Structures are given as C-alpha cells and as structure tokens.
Amino acid sequence: MPLTLLQDWCRGEHLNTRRCMLILGIPEDCGEDEFEETLQEACRHLGRYRVIGRMFRREENAQAILLELAQDIDYALLPREIPGKGGPWEVIVKPRNSDGEFLNRLNRFLEEERRTVSDMNRVLGSDTNCSAPRVTISPEFWTWAQTLGAAVQPLLEQMLYRELRVFSGNTISIPGALAFDAWLEHTTEMLQMWQVPEGEKRRRLMECLRGPALQVVSGLRASNASITVEECLAALQQVFGPVESHKIAQVKLCKAYQEAGEKVSSFVLRLEPLLQRAVENNVVSRRNVNQTRLKRVLSGATLPDKLRDKLKLMKQRRKPPGFLALVKLLREEEEWEATLGPDRESLEGLEVAPRPPARITGVGAVPLPASGNSFDARPSQGYRRRRGRGQHRRGGVARAGSRGSRKRKRHTFCYSCGEDGHIRVQCINPSNLLLVKQKKQAAVESGNGNWAWDKSHPKSKAK
C-alpha cells in the first residue's frame, strides 16, 4: 500500500514521517521543468521542501517521488491531489490520528447516530443503486473497510456495553462485589473512557449498585433528578469512604511505629501514605514534609547508631532528605548490615598495623620484643594527627605494662548540656551552659596531666 511505501522509504532514509509526503501517478515522460513548476504551485503554502528521491512503480506505470518539508505538515493546507500532467497526482502522508484515535472518533460518531458497525456495513452494502460519487470506492478500500468492520465490532461492543463492578455498601460481602476504594477507582476509570450522555452514565451506575449504596443514590435522584454521576460518586465517598478528618490524620501519623521484624525502609513506605493524608488534611505543610518524615523515622524506628547520628545531623542542619533519597539511604544501610551479618564486629575491628619501630641506641637498632600475637597500636601513614599541644606523639619505646598508654582515655562531655558520655551532635538534652563553663574551667586547670607537663617543660640535655 502507498502508506506502507511511505513509511518504509522514510525509515530507510532516516526521515521523520511527519515531514514527508509521497506523490504518486507522475507520468514517466514528465519533464524536470514541468515537474518543478507543478510542485511549486501546489506546495507554495507548505513552505520549503526538497526532493529525496524517485522510483518507478510497475503496477501504476508511473513514478513516485518522496518530498521532505522543512516543518511538520499542516493538514489544513495539504492538498489531496495535485493537478498535473497525465491527470491528478495522488498525495500520500501519514494520517494525523493514530489507529486508537480513529477508533475513538468512529465510536463517538456511531454513538451520536445511535448506530452500530453492523448498521454501517449494511448501509454500505445496500447503497449500490445510488448515483456514482465524485470519487469512486476502489475494491481494495472496500475489502479493507469490511475487514476493519469485522475486527472493530467486538472491541466497540465491549467498550459500549462493558458493565461496572458491583458495589453494595454492606458489611457482609456479596459475591462479585468490591471494596469501596477499589470499586471507586474502577468506576472513575470507566467513566473517563465512556463517550455517552450523562443520562446513560447514570443508568449504568445504578445497574451496578446494590443494598445501601443503591438506596443512597436513589434518594439523591428523588430529590434531584438532574444529579450528575460525579455528584453521586462524591455522595458515596462521604457515606462509604474512609473518614479522614484533621485529628484522625494527625493521630494516625503520630501513632505510626516500626513493627517487629519490619525493615526501616518498609516502615517508611508504610508511613508515606499516612504523611500524604496528613498533608491533604492540612496537618503538615508541604514545605515541611521531608522534615516531618525524618522526625517520624527517628522517633518511630530502630536505627543503627551511625545511621541515627547521620539522620540527626541532617535534621539539625535543616537539610532532610526527600522520600526517594531516604529510602535509598535506608536500603543501602540494610544491604550493608545484611552483607556483614554476624561477623560485622570482627570485620570492623580488623586492622593491619605497620611493623613496630626499633629502639635507637648508640650501637644500633634493637627490635622490640613482641608480646604474644598483638601488634603495637600505631596510626597508619595516612592517619591525620590531631592538632593540639598535648596530643603530639612522643618518641621512644613504650614501657612494660603500658601497652595501652599510647591511646589514652580522654574525658569527653557535651558542650550543650554538660553531661558525660556523648558529644554535642548526639545531644537531645536541654542546654546547660553553666555546667559546660564549669567543666571547661576544670579541664583548663587540670591540664593534660604529667604528660602535658613534660611536653611543656622539657628537661635540659646533658652535655
């Protein structure tokens, strides 16, 4: 078919079919000047164009030429035929509408005329005695129309007469009936698909209702005969839908906690619908959604210490992650925990230290004796030394029994509340600046012990 030829030709030349047109029926003896003059006269409203190629079609005993326009085809200005040498030249372009759009238009037309595909076939088949139209129907088109009618008729019948699913509103389920949320979603989708009058939609809606739901809609129709289907669905939503008030949405969000055996990422997925309902009921503002989500995860889920500290830091800096970023972070942490498994502590504590240094004497270097299988704990070469007067590493050899003297225990306290055992980033207690000031003063007065005194008061070298 010519349309197939156009599509194949454009595909072979890597062209956009929306900018190409195929001209058929050009006589073989048509000169180049005559062809250009005819083409310019016919395509002057379509803008600039160029000839891609030409070929000879044996079945028509004529030439076919492919043109490419500089812009998309304007179907309102496109001629169906071009008057030229040897008769009109046929113009073939890609249809404006796809097959699905064509079926929708055909469906709406048949509904407006109250006809079916069988009626269309009957009218076309019986209308043989009428006067010949200006453009005769070719046998190929007639065969295509019959094939299309036979293929489209079951689809149209299914679209026109597809019944809605049953909904009753009873607490005792009826066979074939759905829950309200699923039924409402299905019904709304079908109403958008139907191209029928409002009265027909209302009749089909009444056919699928049973019990209390039917009584509600019947009462509404008795008080208002012109009620729309959307108003009926809104009334059913108020009667049978879930009750989501401001207070209920707030309580549901606050009472959401991680269940036993539930992953944190699964808890976040379960928390998200509750958070969105809270936003819809104005419990949470949209600009604070991420902060509220992070707050609920910190208070309602069991998190590893490192992950909790990281999320707390995000919360304090007012830079909470979004929903997808938070789920990705939690899943990566869960995958890491699952990969390490029970050997996590042993793998994290495994560290290969460099060889212990030798004691420098006047004679030479004497290696230190090794005690058991332990290594001397020295930082690696890439370790960044802490800055501070009393934190420089001293040279020499560790004394016997002072194996842990290199890594001294430091007295840490929070610079926010003044309590021991945590730092300011991890603090959740109220601020106590007076206690912090007292502990800072005590630390300054005590100094760093004998080690700091030796560093600040070095002994004079013997000459």
Swiss-Prot record:
Record PROSITE patterns: ZF_CCHC
Biased composition (Basic residues): 383-396
GO BP of this protein: positive regulation of apoptotic process
Span list, region Disordered: 363-410, 440-463
GO molecular function annotation: nucleic acid binding; zinc ion binding
GO cellular component: nucleolus
Tissue: Expressed at high levels in the brain and testis. Expressed at lower levels in the heart, trachea and kidney.
Domain of life of the source: Eukaryota
Disulphide linkage map: none
Sorted UniProt keywords: Metal-binding, Nucleus, Tumor antigen, Zinc, Zinc-finger
Entry's localization field: Nucleus, Nucleolus
Pfam hit, one: PNMA
Zinc fingers (CCHC-type) by residue: 412-429
Record-linked PANTHER family: PARANEOPLASTIC ANTIGEN, PARANEOPLASTIC ANTIGEN MA3
Family label: Belongs to the PNMA family.
Note: Antibodies against PNMA3 are present in sera from patients suffering of paraneoplastic neurological disorders.
Name of the protein: Paraneoplastic antigen Ma3
Organism of provenance: Homo sapiens (Human)
Taxonomic lineage of the native organism: Eukaryota, Metazoa, Chordata, Craniata, Vertebrata
